[in-house]
Amino acid sequence: MYAVLKSGGRQYEVRPGQVVKVEKLLGEVGDKVTLDQVLLFSDGTDIQVGQPVLANIAVQGQIVEQGRHRKIVIFKHKRRKDYRKKQGHRQHYTAVRVEEIVTLGQ
């Protein structure tokens, strides 16, 4: 059983029990979250594809970490002009443990 969900403009393939790092979500460690932007769902025998999302499927999970990725360095320069600019960035993320993929009331 797996699902493809959209969170923060990116798509993630998730399975129950998996820990996935998504773009920052509001909440504290231990909070329950429901991700309802499910694009595709497969239970092993049948595949459901949303157009664009499935209204009756959601992914439930628990926040296990709020953190920041490693730093990336942005370096710009212009040759022979003594122009150099260095900038760093660390993106925030939320690690979510997928507990189950549920079918909402229908």
From Swiss-Prot:
Record's GO cellular component terms: cytoplasm; ribonucleoprotein complex; ribosome
UniProt entry keywords in alphabetical sequence: Ribonucleoprotein, Ribosomal protein, RNA-binding, rRNA-binding
GO BP of this protein: translation
Pfam family, one: Ribosomal_L21p
Signal peptide: none
Keyword Ribosomal protein: yes
InterPro entries from the UniProt entry: bL21-like, bL21-like_sf, Ribosomal_bL21, Ribosomal_bL21_CS
GO MF terms held by the record: rRNA binding; structural constituent of ribosome
Function of the protein: This protein binds to 23S rRNA in the presence of protein L20.
Family: Belongs to the bacterial ribosomal protein bL21 family.
UniProt subunit comment: Part of the 50S ribosomal subunit. Contacts protein L20.
Protein known as: Large ribosomal subunit protein bL21
Annotated gene: rplU
